Amino acid sequence: FPPATGILAAFRQRKKQRFAFGRETLLQHLLFHAGTKEESRENALSTLSVHMKWPENFTRQVCRSLLKDGYITERNGLLLPTEQGKAHNLFYRENVRA
């Protein structure tokens, strides 16, 4: 199989897509619950994989990536969207998902 179109390339592409979608989904989840009475339960780092129904390892990878990019911050065990994260989410909703 040619490297750019083979089975391994398709697998890598699918994995990248799944991760990118996970980032957007988690950011949207955090924004949805930010400032609500459910925030302490829904945005808690300790229970996030349960709420998202994701494997723990995948949840950690997505969180690390969003933290590294400055889209979220961690405070007292809660993940909170930053202004940069809010702006990114708005851009994504207006331009990518349209």
Please identify what each model-predicted range represents.
Residues Q17-W54:
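Short amphipathic alpha-helical interface segments
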Residues M52-K68:
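Short amphipathic alpha-helical interaction segments
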Residues E83-A98:
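Short, amphipathic alpha-helical interaction segments positioned at domain boundaries
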Residues F1-Q17:
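Long, low-complexity, charged/polar intrinsically disordered regions in eukaryotic proteins
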Residues F1-P2, Q61, T73:
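Extended, hydrophobic interaction surfaces within ordered domains
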Residues L67-G77:
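A short, conserved structural fragment
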